[in-house]
Amino acid sequence: MEMENSASQQLSISVSQIVLRQREYFLTNETKSIDFRLKQLKKLKKSVEKYSDDIYEALWKDLHKCKEEAFLTELSIVINEINDHIKHLKKWAKPKKVKTPLYLMPSKSYVMYEPFGLALIIAPWNYPFHLMFAPLVGAISSGCCAVLKPSPYSQYTSEVMQMIIDDTFDKEYITMIQGHRDVNQALLSQKFDFIFYTGSPDMGRVVMEAASKNLTPVVLELGGKSPCIVDKGCNIDFAARRIVWGKTINAGQTCVAPDYMFVHKSVRKELIAKMIEYVEKFYGKDSQESDHYCRIINDKAYNRLVSYLDEGKIIYGGQCDAEERYIQFTLLDLSQQTTDNRQQSWLMLGVMKDEIFGPILPVIEFDDIDVVRDFVVNRPKPLAFYYFGEDENAYDLLGKTTSGGVCINDTILHVGNDHLPFGGVGESGMGKYHSQESFLVFSNKRAVLKSSNKIDFAMKYPPYDKIDLIKKLM
């Protein structure tokens, strides 16, 4: 016990010293220079390109993620984000003039963007490179210093990211600290100026509680159960292909993956047949033999997912291999629940309580879209919402539901558009990022009003005998 306490104290001291050195460096104001920020972004891009083969190899070892998928979902997103910030940073960082009311004249008003200061970025294991470096780009472009904490579960990728950070930046500017829960606790006990967390809602609550002690602003990129609705009038072929892709990319270990699917009874049979056709077209008859099909991250996650397979009727899939942590894409029919209250019956199932985060897709048949809408509305607000069907119903659902993002007649693609803000709402998170939103989220919007030193507005002073005139000017 004494040894554990001693190790904990040493870790706390080490983390405290890192934070202290970064705060001292930030106070030199060097990171506030636009030229400095652009230089760091270009250095980061060069290092990412230098280590790209190592990143690909690490992602393969951690997740069985093929090079093509790693490029599309990890490296290209980060490189594009860096390029976007390099191109637009000067414009984004320029003070923004705003109108000044007549009764405050003669004055000038503007908003200036200054870095929060020291940022803590905690990233998950499912897209370990993308979800660490994309927020980091925002921290750099805003002028922050940063401490990075990767997930211990994607260890190979964490090691490569450590090499990139150590090779690119001075530790008093940007540094990475690896470890498990003890490191998280040590970091969250420190006073940061901003915390950016991506991960589970449960850990998000821990982060928010820790941040509240210092009133530290946070962005929480969490998850949740993102519904997918396939209505009559949809393009069944497109719906099948796009849902299978959205659910099987990274073996379903994606925060915005379709979590469960409501399908109208009139299209159910044809949709299921098409989905089976496409999953075998993508990965072959045996997806375990495909180099393009990922694996589950660890044994704990694998065992949790396997337990869901007994909670419904398997329409397709269900094959597993514990040694490889392989789970076949599985369609799980929940429509056969025969209790008086089907919704209550579904909600008793683990597969409908928890975010699935794997290649298992519950299928629920419906014939009344209003019932589906009410089901979604009465659940925690999801990170994403997917609808396949006619435009009229799509826009009606948009107006009566809430989510972090939406795709109509597709899945996941909204995340790939860097012109759209990405983030959750309610239990699926708070705060948005990507492109300019990333710059803004790490920046304090400082309101500035500069009054004239030659003319004064005398009516604003007591005894307020001109109040009627002031009212007319307001």
Segments the model singles out, each with a brief description of its role:
Residues 15, 34, 52, 236, ...:
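Residues at or immediately preceding the N-termini of alpha-helices
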Residues 6, 169, 202-346, 408, ...:
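ALDH superfamily catalytic-core signature
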Residues 30, 45-48, 52, 63, ...:
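Structural signal for hydrophobic packing residues in well-ordered secondary-structure cores
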Residues 102-238:
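Rossmann-like NAD(P) dinucleotide-binding subdomain of oxidoreductase/dehydrogenase enzymes
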Residues 24-30, 121, 228-230, 260-263, ...:
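Short, well-ordered beta-strand elements within core beta-sheets of diverse protein domains
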Residues 37, 82, 143, 174, ...:
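Residue-level signal for inorganic ion chemistry
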Residues 2, 36, 327-474:
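Conserved C-terminal structural/oligomerization subdomain of aldehyde/semialdehyde dehydrogenase
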Residues 1-110:
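N-terminal Rossmann-like NAD(P)+-binding subdomain of aldehyde/semialdehyde dehydrogenases
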